[in-house]
Amino acid sequence: GWTQIEQCPFGKETPAKAISDGYHLWQERGAVEAQNNLTDIGRALAKLPIDPRVSRMILAARDMGALREVLIIAAALSVQDVRDRPQEARQQADAAHVKFADPQSEFLSYLNIWRWFEDAVAHKKSNRQLQELCRANFLNHLRLREWRDVHSQLRTQVLEQGWRENEIEPTYEQLHCALLTGLLGNVGFKNEAKPLPNATAQ
């Protein structure tokens, strides 16, 4: 068998940069060591056949007591934004979305939308009424359904690994520390003297 990805017979020539970027992504998340061998984190991530950014935040959430919420957010990040903002009705859409916004974090807005939709599904009288309710709130019904489907798939995968969802709501710090493990490349620094664009800047 092959021991290195460079030895794998891909269908067409794979640019060396693509392989290098892949290694960097995994190194950044603690999944491989300097010699590109899998770490314990890497072996755990390999059991979740999803984007390593998403699987890394889910793994951290398991250890930080925020798995239930991070599964919801991770699924949201895996689909197109469920909020509709048509050009001809942007002000109305923004006004409708205010109820879901959280002043502290965009991630918490996802949880607000999720809870709203779960409540709407639980109390719906018909699919048509549910679709109309979503439309009135400038939410895309089909993408909301896709979000639920992805969440169900992610949840099934982690439960099959023997992981357990938290019963106690996590703190702001627990939730966001877990999420940031998968989003390191998007973390910004504020340096008045010499601002850096992101956490991976040289």
Residue ranges and their predicted role:
Residues 1-202:
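Second RecA-like catalytic domain
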